[in-house]
Amino acid sequence: GHLGELECECFNAYRSDVKFTGVASHTNNARANGMVNAISMASSFVSNLPKNQSPETTDGREGFYCPLKISGSMEEALVSLFLRDFDKKQMEKRKETVQMLAETVANLFGGKVQVTHVQQYLNMKEELDKVPFVKEVLVKAFDECGVKPVMTPIRGGTDGSRLTELGIPTPNIFTGSHNYHSASEWVSLTQMVKATDIVITLSNLITKI
């Protein structure tokens, strides 16, 4: 990220897999045979996700639903999506929304649906708040290196969020990289060196605690 970024808060993250099951039939007599098209169900499900709660329509602390992939056939179709939110209670509501929407679509078409939620990572803020000295010593390392810390919540996850969950408090600092996950991703060598200086300074400070 940009010079000075210091992140102690990230999304709670889940992946949801929504599997629709239809009834295959020859198209010649589909009505008489009760065809239920799983692809149509999957398409309807995605189309009815809240349009003002997608990655491209949100920022800051707003969460979202992000469809990742639709695959399958008339008989079975799978929709995979990311659920993201900084607040745990709001995340539970998002999971409930996915379940309710999936069941509504399945009932409307006369098919079946199975929803599975998989936890990916959790907001590290809750655990980092229990050990304030971790952030304090990191801010001191920034100061000694002449870098003003810019506290921002990260709209994503980090290796640190998973380490924090495992009991190793690990805030995230800038690396000099920009435009992540795009064709124009690039890195500033100057900022990378400054990040390295901070890590070295942090290591020295920690040995004195």
Task: List the predicted regions and their residue ranges.
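Redox- and metal-dependent alpha/beta enzyme cores, enriched for Fe-S-associated oxidoreductases
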Residues: M100-L108
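A short, flexible beta-alpha/helix-coil linker loop
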Residues: V23-T27, R84, Q120-N123, H178-H181
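Short, small-residue-enriched loops and turns at beta-alpha junctions
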Residues: L3-E5, K89, Y121-D129, G160, ...
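Non-cysteine beta-strand/loop elements that form the S-adenosyl-L-methionine
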Residues: S16-V18, P171-G176
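Conserved short beta-strand edge segments in small beta-sheet-based binding/regulatory domains
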Residues: N107-H117
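Active-site-adjacent substrate-binding region
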Residues: S40-T57, F64-C66, K112-V113, L122-P171
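His/Asp/Glu-rich mid-to-C-terminal helical/loop segments that flank catalytic regions of hydrolases
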Residues: V36-P55, K89-Q90, K95-L101, E136-E144, ...
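Midchain, well-structured core segments that form catalytic/ion-binding scaffolds
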Residues: G1-E96, E103
